[in-house]
Amino acid sequence: MTTHPTTAHTPKAAPLPRSRLRAHLVLAGFAAVGLAALTWAAFVQPLPRLIYNPSDSVPGGWYRVEPQRPGADSLSRPLSVGSVVLTTLPPEVAALAAQRGYLPAHVPLLKRVGAVAPQHVCIVAGQVRIDGVPMAAALPADRLGRPLPSWQLCRRLEAGELFLLSVTNPASFDSRYFGPVSASAVIGVAHPVWLETRP
């Protein structure tokens, strides 16, 4: 009996064109959705920022900043007393803050909103009063004995003005020394993410 050698053929998996096409379509769909989401986020709303605050003007820790539209005269949402904003200082105030080491040049700062329009703010004889209620002292000098600007004010805040006032640091450099700031200087509204516990 003659045996004929047989060659074992292992079947090779043939490419499945439909499966590949389907996978490519799904990937292309995800890519298109991702690109559309990025485009929408870039044009419709800026991405939130995460910043760290080491100072005592507001509680120290990490904050998420909801950006303000650039060049807007008023905030997209009205602010209330107690809101924390990331803002720039007027140029002459920023120069003084940098010169004295309160804040590096061109660095925005986090401050609490102490009063908004149409609240009445009065700074007389070293005392800050908001709607007639004493809120803070305006110190004559900083911790190193350097005289602080004596900013006298007794009027209602106008639309688009914010009076920044710390309640956590009596020596904070804020509106009691440089006056109200314009809402157009506000970069965004800060929301605490994680706050430090300090002794």
State what each model feature region is:
Residues 124-195:
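Non-cytosolic head/periplasmic domains of membrane-anchored proteins
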Residues 68, 90, 118-120, 168:
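Short loop segments at secondary-structure junctions
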Residues 104-137:
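Mid-length scaffold segments of soluble, non-membrane domains
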